[in-house]
């Protein structure tokens, strides 16, 4: 495997794997920034809002159509804590150019979509679309309430979050 990783800005990396044995390719852009309690809600909402669209493709319907035209490419925006940092990953997966029926340059379109999502989000004025943020906030709140109500899942997640006071993880 030939995984290549390029820093395209401080704390921002582009990863590229030129493996020939697969018929699909993936482009990922990773952002790393300090994890802070006071920004936890914003960090949880950010990928949900970013996945809805970007400046050149501002809504979910347009985004879905664009991905369908790219032979069902898949765009994901994911965020997760990694030690003392928070990692945001914008990733797109789709078929390689050589499998395009009409010779389309799909990889260029994948890169444009990933870069647009990462660096040119859809703003209303100078902020994310308040309607999209409100919808995603409600959906996230419901998901968290559902998790708390699912006692078994809630206990599992709490057990995996922090070690007991003795410093040893329960088994």
Regions found by a protein language model. Name each.
Residues 130-133, 149:
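Conserved phosphate/pyrophosphate-binding and hydrolysis machinery centered on Walker-type P-loop NTPases
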Residues 11, 72-74, 130:
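Generic secondary-structure boundary/loop-capping signal
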Residues 53-56, 98-101, 120-129:
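Short, polar/flexible loop-turn hinges at active-site or ligand-entry regions and domain interfaces
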Residues 1-11:
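Short, Gly/Pro- and small/polar-rich lid/capping loops
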Residues 15-17, 23-38, 43, 60-120, ...:
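M16 family metallopeptidases and their MPP-like homologs
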Residues 44-51:
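Active-site SXXK
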